[in-house]
């Protein structure tokens, strides 16, 4: 068996963010090869996410957020978001509550329209396709390129409109889907957004 050094353990933890026990096991099972251990941990993480996805998230909380453009003025925007987990114990943790606050603030800033892509009505997607196709023809794009251009535009619309596909406003390298997966791995439960509402507040 290969010697496992403290430097190897530290490097793998920095690369993956995995716990100490998982990192040690990954290195032992892969003869100290950091790259193989990294792949092993990645596959284990995918398996854990898939396992959690099959479970029911029946607990959680509803977080509210009021946005003010000026601390001295009344709020102009409100958000309600339902964040679900499997147990009441996790719902009461500070990490879960902070995640709900982060999501509410993200929704206020990013203005998503749907939680998941399958919630987008087909007629909405078709309307977007027609708009992009008409624009491409008006710009004189080659006929053979229009389909690819339109699909790229539609995919962009989905990514900007769907909460789970949006980049997190606090870290553009992480999507909201990845943020929830990371939280689920950390808390050991399935974490999901049930629904949300974003609304403007009119002053009398």
Swiss-Prot record:
InterPro entries on file: EF-Ts_dimer_sf, Transl_elong_EFTs/EF1B, Transl_elong_EFTs/EF1B_dimer, Transl_elong_Ts_CS, UBA-like_sf
Annotated stretches, region: Involved in Mg(2+) ion dislocation from EF-Tu: 87-90
Signal peptide span: none
Molecular function GO labels: translation elongation factor activity
Highest taxon of the lineage: Bacteria
Subcellular location: Cytoplasm
Keywords of this entry: Cytoplasm, Elongation factor, Protein biosynthesis
Listed GO CC annotations: cytoplasm
Family: Belongs to the EF-Ts family.
Function of the protein: Associates with the EF-Tu.GDP complex and induces the exchange of GDP to GTP. It remains bound to the aminoacyl-tRNA.EF-Tu.GTP complex up to the GTP hydrolysis stage on the ribosome.
Protein name: Elongation factor Ts
Species of origin: Frankia alni (strain DSM 45986 / CECT 9034 / ACN14a)
Protein's gene: tsf
């Amino acid at each position: 068996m290969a010697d496992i050094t403290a430097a190897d353990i530290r490097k793998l933890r920095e690369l993956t963010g995995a716990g100490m026990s998982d990192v040690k096991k990954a290195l032992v099972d892969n003869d100290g090869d950091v790259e193989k251990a990294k792949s092993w941990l990645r596959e284990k993480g995918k398996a854990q996410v898939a396992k959690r996805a099959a479970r029911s998230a029946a607990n959680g909380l509803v977080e509210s957020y009021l946005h003010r453009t000026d601390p001295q003025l009344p709020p102009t925007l409100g958000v309600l978001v339902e964040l679900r987990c499997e147990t009441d114990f996790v719902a009461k943790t500070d990490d879960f509550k902070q995640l709900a606050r982060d999501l509410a603030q993200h929704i206020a800033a990013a203005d998503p329209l749907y939680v998941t892509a399958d919630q987008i009505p087909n007629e909405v997607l078709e309307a977007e396709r027609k708009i992009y196709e008409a624009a491409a023809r008006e710009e004189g794009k080659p006929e053979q390129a229009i389909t690819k251009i339109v699909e790229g535009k539609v995919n962009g619309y989905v990514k900007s409109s769907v909460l789970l596909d949006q980049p997190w406003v606090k870290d553009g390298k992480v999507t909201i889907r990845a943020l929830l997966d990371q939280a689920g791995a950390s808390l050991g439960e399935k974490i999901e957004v049930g629904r949300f509402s974003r609304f403007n507040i009119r002053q009398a």
